């Protein structure tokens, strides 16, 4: 139980730091505000099997047996921005980021409710680590805190470290004149390679967090309130099992195509690392029985052992996938499950993949079609259909 209490306390402290600085935001009361993601056009080519491996690693799950270390390294090394395979941005879900201003510098950060640190790329990094990133210059506007250093490590093995400065921060019109900012002096190569973002803003809120992500369009994060204009119908709530410190709950069935299994109960963790689309928890990772039944409805689909996941011809029309939440049906459009094309082929990699050990994980493929409420009062989690 200590895990969630520690993180929730850290989030609430950061909320107080922001809300005390600005009592009114866009007509809302203190502590209630919205963030709209910004579109970012990236030339980086992601190799889908590597992204699956990275997701499994983040959640401490073993990779599929056929996905060897050699193939992972080969995939990652050859299919980056300097790779030889040409892929147009439209073949992947467009990338979206969250814009902030630190000092006089505009940066793009990931919003992460799974961590409590606020750190950014800085001019104190080695020059090779700064390449293709927007940089915070603490020497221009910041006040260094003597004898203050930091280090962050994440579940996927990545990390960063550096010094601490006080500086002004602006997030969606929410202004703080003297915020502690962790300026990186070292970051792992994965963050250097991830050119879409320049740091992580880790925080949570006292009451609830809400996310409304979109498919190939900017999503929203509303903090402290529920915007009724963004969903249809009354949200359906499920209790959370927080024993392991996760947003974990039990669903009571699923359906796909002609298959309707309303008695198959399964536990799942709802991905709450708000990084869209290709970092954090992008996939829906469900029990093997569910994924096999879904792909049995997809013509010419096959389990690709070399790449460790289900794939299918890119011109295939995919059926919707539905998760039963009491009387509510959470529909994931088939088009959202067409996650990415394997470079140099006419084969697409699915956003729905199997996971060997419970619980299942519902990441971006699920979230971007849903209106989801993370409510710390309970705790509980709510689901409703997005309003188009």
Swiss-Prot record:
Alphabetical keyword list: Aspartyl protease, Glycoprotein, Hydrolase, Protease, Secreted, Signal, Virulence
Enzyme class, UniProt record, top EC level: hydrolase
Domain Peptidase A1 stretches: 96-384
GO cellular component annotations of the record: extracellular region
Organism superkingdom: Eukaryota
Single GO MF annotation: aspartic-type endopeptidase activity
Known function: Probable aspartic-type endopeptidase which contributes to virulence.
Listed name of the protein: Probable aspartic-type endopeptidase MCYG_06955
């Amino acid at each position: 139980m200590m895990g969630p209490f520690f993180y929730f306390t850290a989030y609430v402290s950061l909320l107080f730091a922001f809300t005390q600085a600005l009592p009114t935001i866009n007509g809302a009361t203190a502590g209630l505000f919205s963030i709209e993601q910004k579109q970012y056009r990236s030339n980086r080519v992601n190799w889908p099997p590597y992204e699956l491996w990275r997701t499994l690693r983040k959640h401490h799950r073993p990779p599929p047996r056929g996905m060897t270390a050699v193939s992972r390294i080969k995939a990652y090394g050859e299919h980056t921005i300097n790779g030889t395979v040409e892929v147009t941005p439209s073949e992947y879900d467009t990338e979206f980021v969250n814009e902030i201003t630190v000092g006089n510098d505009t940066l793009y950060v990931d919003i992460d409710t799974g961590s409590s640190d606020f750190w950014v790329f800085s001019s104190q990094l080695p020059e090779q680590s700064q390449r293709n990133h927007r940089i915070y210059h603490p020497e221009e506007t910041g006040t260094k805190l003597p004898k203050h250093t930091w280090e962050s490590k994440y579940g996927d093995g990545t990390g960063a470290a550096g010094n601490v400065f006080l500086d002004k921060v602006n997030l969606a019109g929410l202004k703080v004149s003297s915020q502690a900012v962790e300026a990186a002096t070292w970051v792992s190569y994965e963050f250097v390679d991830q050119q879409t973002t320049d740091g992580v803003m880790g925080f949570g809120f006292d009451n609830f967090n809400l996310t409304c992500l979109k498919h190939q369009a900017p999503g929203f994060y509303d903090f402290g309130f529920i915007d009724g204009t963004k969903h249809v119908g009354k949200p359906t709530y499920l209790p959370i099992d927080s024993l392991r410190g996760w947003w974990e709950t039990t669903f009571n069935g699923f359906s796909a195509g002609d298959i309707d299994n309303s008695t198959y109960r399964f536990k799942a963790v709802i991905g709450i690392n708000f990084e869209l689309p290709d970092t954090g928890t992008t996939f829906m990772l469900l029990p093997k029985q569910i994924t096999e039944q879904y792909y049995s409805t997809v013509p010419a689909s096959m389990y690709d052992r070399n790449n460790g996941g289900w794939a299918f011809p890119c011109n295939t029309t995919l059926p919707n996938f539905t998760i039963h939440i009491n009387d509510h049906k959470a529909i994931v459009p088939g088009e959202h499950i067409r996650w990415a094309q394997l470079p140099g082929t006419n084969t697409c990699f699915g956003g729905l993949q199997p996971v060997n050990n419970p619980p299942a994980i519902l990441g971006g493929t699920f979230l971007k079609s849903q209106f989801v409420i993370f409510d710390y009062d309970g705790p509980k989690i709510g689901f409703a259909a997005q309003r188009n």
